């Protein structure tokens, strides 16, 4: 690819330079040298005219008539001869030709190097030197141009800017092909990178075809994806294995606590042990949920309507809020908007952020839904302590806790929002945290609408 770019660049540059340098020389309206045949013809005419004048004695009263007779006699068919005296008088010219004749005489006045030049449909040739005793005349030939140069070509030569534009248009296909050959594999690489950024770790064999440099980059990209996929799989397996292994000692701990209560009765120590065991059990459950969600293949997707998916979650949250003495309002309920995904994962995502609001709010929780042509937006607001701007991106990390008002007594396992982010990203959506109009935290979920293709 590097060699191709280099070659195309220099080829284009060479073509442009060649056009700029050579085109003016191809203008038939420029002074050009005579062909050998034209040179011989001119010398022959010159000799015939000299001989004719030598055979025709001069007449002082009508000296020009003998000049007319000579040039009329020896003019080639369809052409005319002109004689220019040493005083600059032109013999044999028509009035409407005087301007071009004077222009040509001003440029071609050396009989040792006769030239030719086009003027529209006419062409002038000369000069050739004719001796008439002590007088010397310049002999010129005026004839029809063999092929008239088109007005468009004349316009090109007369307008350098237009010539530059035409040159650019001529070179444009080559440059467009070069740009396309570079942009196509680069676009494929970008699309593949976007898929990886969205969590879709799959191989892209099409990246390993094309120019050598992009082929190598595509192979490296696929190797990176393979390594990431292997690492993610190992991490998920480790997380799942640890969670399952913790189940056995946790079950034994809960069983031992129950036996100890039977023997010794209730105590603060036993109550604390049961509380921590229950929290550990919840944490293990959350770890297993997150591990399953991160394994994309485990998510069985289907088409579901938003109101059918989330109405039960909202009803349960309203009931729990009433029991807690808090206000729970749904300002704009969900409609029958189509979503495509795993119902359990999507239901769990909304449930987690609603429970988060119930846990940290003082008295108010508000939920609103909106839809546009692209997707569904869900806002969950509370009037709790909120989260500082520097912590808003971090709260979606597993086990991350803010310093203020987020201790273990009120903060759950620290995995709820991580589960939310994983589930939403699995469905090509996003979740973010912001300030709430109620004074606390606003959690926003966006999910794309399902569109049949």
Swiss-Prot record:
Locate the transmembrane regions by residue number.
5-25, 160-180
> Where does this chain mainly localize?
membrane
Is Protease among the key words of this record? no
| Entry GO terms, CC | plasma membrane
The EC number(s) attached to this protein equal: 2.7.13.3
Q: Where in the cell is it found?
A: Cell inner membrane
Record membrane topology:
Multi-pass membrane protein
- The active site of this protein is located at 244 (nucleophile)
Q: Which positions are annotated as binding ATP?
A: 244-247, 355-360, 382, 401-402, 412-417
Side Periplasmic, residues = 26-159
Q: Histidine kinase domain location, by residue?
A: 241-451
What is catalysed by this protein?
ATP + protein L-histidine = ADP + protein N-phospho-L-histidine
Domain named HAMP: which ranges?
180-233
Effects seen without this gene? Deletion in the CG43 strain significantly increases FimA production but slightly decreases MrkA production. A double cpxR-cpxA mutant in the CG43 strain activates expression of pecS and pecM. Increases production of the major pilin of type 3 fimbriae MrkA as well as that of type 1 fimbriae FimA. Increases mannose-sensitive yeast agglutination activity and reduces biofilm formation in the CG43 strain. Increases promoter activities of fimA, fimB and mrkA, decreases ryhB and cpxP, but has no effect on fur.
The molecular function terms in GO held by this entry are: ATP binding; phosphorelay sensor kinase activity
**Matching Pfam families:** CpxA_peri, HAMP, HATPase_c, HisKA
The record's annotation in InterPro entries points to:
Bact_Sensor_His_Kinase, CpxA_peri, CpxA_peri_sf, HAMP_dom, HATPase_C_sf, His_kinase_dom, HisK_dim/P_dom, HisK_dim/P_sf
Query: CDD domains, alphabetically?
Result: HAMP, HATPase_CpxA-like, HisKA
Q: Residues on the Cytoplasmic side? A: 1-4, 181-453
Q: How is its activity regulated?
A: The two-component system is activated by envelope stress such as overexpression of some (misfolded) periplasmic proteins.
Q: Which residues carry this modification: Phosphohistidine?
A: 244
Q: How does it assemble?
A: Interacts with cognate response regulator CpxR.
- Describe its function: Histidine kinase member of the two-component regulatory system CpxA/CpxR which responds to envelope stress response by activating or, in some cases, repressing expression of downstream genes. Activates CpxR by phosphorylation.
Please report the name of this protein according to its UniProt entry. Sensor histidine kinase CpxA
Q: Which organism is it from?
A: Klebsiella pneumoniae subsp. pneumoniae (strain HS11286)
The lineage is: Bacteria, Pseudomonadati, Pseudomonadota, Gammaproteobacteria, Enterobacterales
């Amino acid at each position: 690819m590097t060699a191709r770019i280099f070659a195309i660049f220099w080829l284009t540059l060479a073509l442009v330079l060649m056009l700029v340098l050579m085109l003016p020389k191809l203008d038939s309206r420029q002074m050009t040298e005579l062909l050998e045949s034209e040179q011989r013809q001119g010398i022959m005419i010159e000799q015939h005219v000299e001989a004719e004048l030598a055979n025709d004695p001069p007449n002082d009263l009508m000296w020009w008539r003998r000049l007319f007779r000579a040039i009329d006699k020896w003019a080639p068919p369809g052409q005319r001869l002109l004689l220019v005296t040493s005083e600059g008088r032109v013999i044999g010219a028509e009035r409407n030709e005087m301007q071009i004749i004077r222009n040509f005489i001003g440029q071609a006045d050396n009989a040792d190097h006769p030239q030719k030049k086009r003027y529209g449909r006419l062409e002038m040739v000369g000069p050739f030197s004719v001796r008439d005793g002590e007088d010397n005349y310049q002999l010129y030939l005026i004839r029809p141009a063999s092929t008239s140069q088109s007005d468009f070509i004349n316009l090109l030569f007369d307008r350098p800017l237009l010539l530059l534009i035409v040159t650019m248009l001529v070179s444009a296909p080559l440059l467009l092909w070069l740009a396309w050959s570079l942009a196509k594999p680069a676009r494929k690489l970008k699309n593949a990178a976007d898929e990886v950024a969205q969590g879709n770790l799959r191989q892209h064999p099409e990246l390993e075809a094309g120019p050598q440099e992009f082929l190598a980059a595509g192979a490296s990209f696929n190797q990176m994806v393979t390594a990431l996929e292997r690492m993610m799989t190992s991490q998920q397996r480790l997380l799942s294995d640890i969670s399952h292994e913790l189940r056995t000692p946790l079950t034994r701990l809960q069983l031992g606590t129950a036996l100890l209560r039977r023997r010794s009765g209730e105590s603060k120590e036993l109550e604390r042990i049961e509380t921590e065991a229950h929290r550990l059990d919840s944490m293990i459950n959350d770890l297993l949920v997150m591990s399953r969600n991160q394994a994309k293949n485990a998510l069985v997707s289907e088409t579901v309507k938003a109101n059918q998916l989330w109405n039960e979650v909202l009803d349960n949250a309203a009931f729990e809020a009433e029991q807690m003495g808090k206000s729970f309002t749904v300002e704009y309920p969900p409609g029958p908007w189509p979503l495509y995904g795993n119902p359990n994962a999507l239901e769990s995502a909304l449930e987690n952020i609603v429970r988060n609001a119930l846990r940290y709010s003082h008295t108010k929780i508000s939920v609103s839904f909106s839809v546009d042509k692209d997707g569904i937006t869900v806002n969950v607001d509370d009037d709790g302590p909120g989260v500082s701007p520097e912590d808003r991106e971090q709260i979606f990390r597993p086990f991350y806790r803010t310093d203020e008002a987020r201790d273990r007594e009120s903060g759950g396992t620290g995995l709820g929002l991580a589960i939310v982010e994983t589930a939403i990203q699995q469905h090509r959506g996003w979740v973010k945290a912001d300030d709430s109009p109620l004074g606390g935290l606003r959690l926003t979920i966006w999910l794309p609408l399902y569109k049949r293709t």
